[in-house]
């Protein structure tokens, strides 16, 4: 084999590899859309209807905090839910969507002067 044919094969292999990576990247899903705050309790209860133990307790904590409009507590509770072991892919996506909506509301509360909401936001920033 000549160095030219080896080099040609190398370039073709690299081009094929690049093409595969590009194609795989094109199939990425869009980021999850947030849900409305009013829908979160129902969605969580439906999505976790068979949950037991700490997962069920975390869902209850989120729903209770939302009903009380306690945004800092809801944010901490949804974060706790997100760290529970054994969540299915659909449950993880639901939690991510709920987290976006809750944290957006908490940001509004912090901007309106809710000191506890601002403290929780600062903790979230430090954890990143």
Language-model regions: role of each:
Residues 2-15:
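Bacterial N-terminal signal peptides that target proteins for export
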Residues 21-25:
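C-terminal motif of bacterial Sec signal peptides marking the signal peptidase cleavage site
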Residues 26-30:
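Bacterial signal peptide processing site
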Residues 31-35, 49, 84-92, 124-128:
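Short solvent-exposed coil/turn linkers within tandem alpha-helical repeat scaffolds
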Residues 33, 40-80:
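Post-signal-peptide N-terminal segment of Sec-exported extracytoplasmic proteins
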Residues 60, 72, 96, 100-107:
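Generic structural signal for well-ordered, non-transmembrane alpha-helical segments
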Residues 78-103:
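Short, charge-rich amphipathic alpha-helical segments embedded
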Residues 100-126:
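Alpha-helical linker/edge segments of TPR/alpha-solenoid repeat scaffolds
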């Amino acid at each position: 084999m000549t160095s030219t044919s080896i080099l040609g094969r190398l370039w073709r292999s690299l081009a094929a590899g690049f093409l595969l990576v590009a194609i795989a990247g094109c199939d990425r899903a869009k980021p999850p859309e947030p849900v409305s705050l009013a829908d979160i309790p129902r969605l969580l209860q439906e999505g976790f209807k068979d949950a037991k133990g700490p997962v069920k307790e975390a869902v209850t904590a989120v729903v209770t905090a939302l009903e009380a409009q306690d945004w800092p507590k809801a944010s901490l509770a949804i974060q706790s839910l997100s760290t529970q072991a054994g969540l299915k892919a659909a449950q993880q996506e639901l939690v991510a969507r709920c987290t976006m909506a809750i944290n957006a509301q908490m940001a509004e509360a912090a901007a309106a002067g809710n000191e506890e909401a601002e403290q929780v936001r600062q903790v979230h920033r430090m954890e990143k």
